[in-house]
């Protein structure tokens, strides 16, 4: 390993850790800083800016913001809340189910924020430590990105894998089955072996004595806007249209032989159509869209993806020959190592889509996968869930939100940073999803 590689690696890791330390948008800013240092000081060719991923995120978030302003998100949250409150004893299973499918529908895990107060309240009412359902609910909202038809990560992966002979419907089937089953397996383990008794928590008893724990309260809800339900149906119809169109242009289905609109363009345009219909049908004040929390968090995600994905692509592209040689030797003999690489890469790159974009094309080249020689393509499909390790560093917004909203103190970040409430459930969920993927993918594909 020569000195230039060590310097480049130091810049890569230094930029990422500086961004993580500064927090928020800074991970995107320092990603751009890292690209500048690699290019201007160390002579590396700048990588490709992930325009496709960013545009998809922008389009989806624009539609989600319209849905939120119309009251559609509140409508979905109240429906999910009724489900949780009617079945409080099953909170450890229902909480991740709700956040998982909200993410599947919306294409962003930030929808989990709206469910956190409800999860905490229901858990407290059943004397269950909120950390149990909260931890797997947050993890489920992250891993569901790898199965959502409107997420940038899935759109990118399907665009890469379909030319290799894997049909879009089969990809969705594998990812939906394996990721949801993995979340439920972790929920089962938490239910069976977790320390669930809230009354025995020393942190809870201390906070209770100090008056820091809010009493169980269902609370009053205001009236939903008139167009709330309409906006949900419009959005749901748009998501179904995206899936149907993506299936129709899939070579395996072949309903549309020569599509004028590619999958990326379809999801962007369909999301804009959804937003337009919601604005018109629900008579929204478009000036308020910029104030929506989903819009702000989504645009922040675009900045973060811009920086870290560009930085990651710059580094990987500059060492593509070494990456190909190493990946060919290791992944060819030990397929599960791809999942390990994706796990650690996503931990640093902070985005499922950015990780897939940085790693997967190089692995395809390394393994020599082509439409004629695609026997190893199942490795990529099975390992995809491993790009969801955003929970390892306790700085992700939904993770921090869960810690802040749990007034019992059971959901926490430990003294040693990594010993937090989400690490074990998250690692188990990815291990189960990848393991199931290696079983299911060869059977389905």
State where each predicted segment sits.
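Active-site/pore-lining binding-face segments in mid-to-C-terminal subdomains
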Residues: 360, 364-373, 377-390
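Hydrophobic transmembrane alpha-helices of multi-pass small-molecule transporters
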Residues: 1-64, 203-316, 424-445
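Membrane-interfacial helical/loop segments at transmembrane boundaries in membrane proteins
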Residues: 158-163, 253-258, 324-330
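Membrane-embedded alpha-helical segments and adjacent helix-loop junctions characteristic
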Residues: 18-20, 30-33, 44-128, 132-133, ...
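Membrane-core helix-loop-helix motifs of multi-pass transport proteins
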Residues: 120-231, 376-385, 401-445
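Alpha-helical transmembrane segments
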Residues: 52-61, 173-187, 259-271, 379-393
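Terminal transmembrane helical module of multi-pass membrane proteins
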Residues: 352, 396-404
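Helix-loop-helix module between adjacent transmembrane segments
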Residues: 61-65, 95-111, 136-148, 175-186, ...
């Amino acid at each position: 390993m020569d000195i230039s590689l060590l310097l480049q690696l130091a810049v890569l890791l230094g930029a990422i850790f500086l961004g993580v330390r500064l927090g928020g948008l800074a991970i995107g800013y320092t990603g751009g800083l890292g690209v500048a240092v690699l290019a201007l000081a160390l002579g590396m060719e700048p990588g490709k800016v992930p325009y496709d991923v960013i545009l998809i995120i922008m389009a989806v978030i624009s539609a989600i913001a319209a849905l939120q302003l119309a009251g559609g998100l509140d409508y979905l949250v109240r429906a999910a809340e009724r489900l949780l409150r009617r079945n409080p004893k099953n909170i450890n299973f229902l909480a991740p189910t709700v956040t998982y499918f909200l993410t599947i529908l919306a294409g962003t895990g930030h929808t989990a924020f709206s469910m956190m107060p409800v999860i905490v309240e229901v858990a407290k009412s059943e004397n269950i430590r909120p950390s149990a359902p909260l931890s797997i609910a947050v993890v489920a909202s992250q891993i569901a990105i790898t199965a959502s038809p409107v997420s940038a990560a899935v759109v990118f992966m399907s665009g890469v894998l379909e030319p290799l002979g894997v049909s879009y419907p089969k990809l969705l089937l594998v990812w939906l089955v394996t990721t949801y089953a993995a979340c439920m397996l972790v929920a089962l383990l938490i239910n069976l072996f977790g320390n669930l008794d809230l009354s025995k928590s020393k942190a809870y008893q201390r906070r209770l004595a100090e008056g820091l724990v809010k009493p169980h309260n269902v609370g009053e809800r205001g009236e939903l806007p008139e167009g709330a339900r309409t906006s949900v149906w419009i959005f749901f119809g748009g998501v179904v249209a995206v899936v149907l169109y993506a299936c129709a242009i899939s070579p395996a289905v072949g309903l549309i032989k020569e599509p004028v609109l590619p999958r990326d363009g379809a999801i962007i345009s369909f999301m804009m159509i959804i937003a337009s219909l919601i604005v018109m049908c629900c008579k929204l004040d478009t000036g308020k869209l910029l104030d929506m929390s989903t819009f702000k968090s989504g645009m922040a995600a675009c900045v973060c993806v811009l920086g870290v994905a560009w930085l990651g692509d710059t580094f990987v592209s500059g060492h593509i020959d070494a990456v190909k040689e190493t990946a060919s030797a290791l992944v060819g003999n030990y397929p599960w190592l791809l999942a390990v690489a994706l796990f650690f890469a996503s931990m640093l790159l902070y985005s499922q889509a950015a990780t897939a974009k940085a790693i997967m094309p190089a692995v395809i080249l390394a393994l020599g996968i082509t439409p004629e020689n695609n026997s190893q393509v199942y490795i990529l499909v099975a390992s995809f869930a491993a790009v969801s390790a955003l929970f390892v560093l306790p700085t992700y917004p939904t993770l921090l939100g869960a810690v802040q909203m749990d007034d019992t103190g059971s959901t926490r970040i430990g003294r040693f940073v990594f010993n937090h409430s989400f690490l074990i459930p998250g690692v188990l969920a990815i291990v189960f999803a990848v393991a199931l993927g290696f079983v299911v993918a060869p059977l389905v594909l």
